Amino acid sequence: MTNSLFLLAEGGLFDFNATLPLMVLQILLLMVVLNAIFYTPIARVLDERDEYIRKNLTQASETLAKAEAITKQYEQDLAKERRDAQMIIASSQQEAQEIVAMEIKQAQKDTELLVNEATTQLNSQKEKALQALEKQVNTLSEQIKNKLLSGQLAG
């Protein structure tokens, strides 16, 4: 019966002998070696990469914030310049309308003066013509009167 128990223990799941602690030592030694050779450099590279990415993300965020601030400032400046340009255009149009109105008034005054001068000249020429006609009428009347009187005296 002791033989049968011993046989059962040998063929069991675990054999409790000197190989089990050796296996544990091999696994621990493998973990230490892998940690020193493989995991530590990989962890360092991953940490460096993580730091690099974090640093670049921070710089990108700062650059993006600056770009947005500059864009906003440019948009504000552009809007202000557009308003100023529209005000300048409106004032220029107003000035142009005032200048045109003044020139139209001046042209109307000049036209009135020309019409008045022409009317005055025409009236003056009319008066001269009437005076000349009146002299001719008077002269002709005198001649007719003289002929009539001389015809009556002769006849």
UniProtKB/Swiss-Prot annotation:
This protein's name: ATP synthase subunit b', chloroplastic
Signal peptide (residue range): none
Keyword field: ATP synthesis, CF(0), Chloroplast, Hydrogen ion transport, Ion transport, Membrane, Plastid, Thylakoid, Transmembrane, Transmembrane helix, Transport
Membrane topology, record value: Single-pass membrane protein
Species of origin: Rhodomonas salina
Role noted for this protein: F(1)F(0) ATP synthase produces ATP from ADP in the presence of a proton or sodium gradient. F-type ATPases consist of two structural domains, F(1) containing the extramembraneous catalytic core and F(0) containing the membrane proton channel, linked together by a central stalk and a peripheral stalk. During catalysis, ATP synthesis in the catalytic domain of F(1) is coupled via a rotary mechanism of the central stalk subunits to proton translocation. Component of the F(0) channel, it forms part of the peripheral stalk, linking F(1) to F(0). The b'-subunit is a diverged and duplicated form of b found in plants and photosynthetic bacteria.
One Pfam family, short name: ATP-synt_B
Location, primary (coarse class): plastid
Subunit: F-type ATPases have 2 components, F(1) - the catalytic core - and F(0) - the membrane proton channel. F(1) has five subunits: alpha(3), beta(3), gamma(1), delta(1), epsilon(1). F(0) has four main subunits: a(1), b(1), b'(1) and c(10-14). The alpha and beta chains form an alternating ring which encloses part of the gamma chain. F(1) is attached to F(0) by a central stalk formed by the gamma and epsilon chains, while a peripheral stalk is formed by the delta, b and b' chains.
Coiled-coil positions: none
Keyword Ion transport: yes
GO cellular component: chloroplast thylakoid membrane; proton-transporting ATP synthase complex
PANTHER family referenced in this protein's UniProt entry, alphabetically: ATP SYNTHASE SUBUNIT B', CHLOROPLASTIC
Compartments where found: Plastid, Chloroplast thylakoid membrane
